[in-house]
């Protein structure tokens, strides 16, 4: 038996994936799922365009993006994003950034900015997820509650979470 703490996007997806092979309980302190950071943030699925100095993070972002947009495709829609390189104070120039995009196989176009602050950048496609539809979907398929004597507890809460004390289960 697995207890997932936190009904944000991470907690809901993890509970959904695990419930195909395990008994899973999702505990969220709010009445509705996807209300905290999952609701207040941009709800944009990142491919890794904004991590030019971390290939490992880009690979993880791409993998997560592909998983999410495949499994939850009916809740996702594409969005065009421009990543512009500042004329002054940037830690990367446009040529290095474009090389990074090619090396990481991130789809993009090159764009000339009309801003005085940035001359060049990349046109990129990412995705947004529909929080209202996902909330309804997860609300129907996930078992909410507190597990009695769980074998595992997965803490997917955000900054206001107290630490879990180890008792008769493993903390992952």
Regions of interest found by a model, annotated:
Residues 1-25:
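N-terminal Rossmann-like FAD-binding beta1-loop-alpha1 element of flavoenzymes
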Residues 18-23, 73, 118-119, 142-151, ...:
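Short glycine/proline-enriched coil/turn segments at helix->beta-strand junctions
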Residues 19-40:
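Glycine-rich FAD pyrophosphate-binding loop
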Residues 30-33, 44, 52-55, 69, ...:
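Rossmann-like dinucleotide-binding core of oxidoreductases
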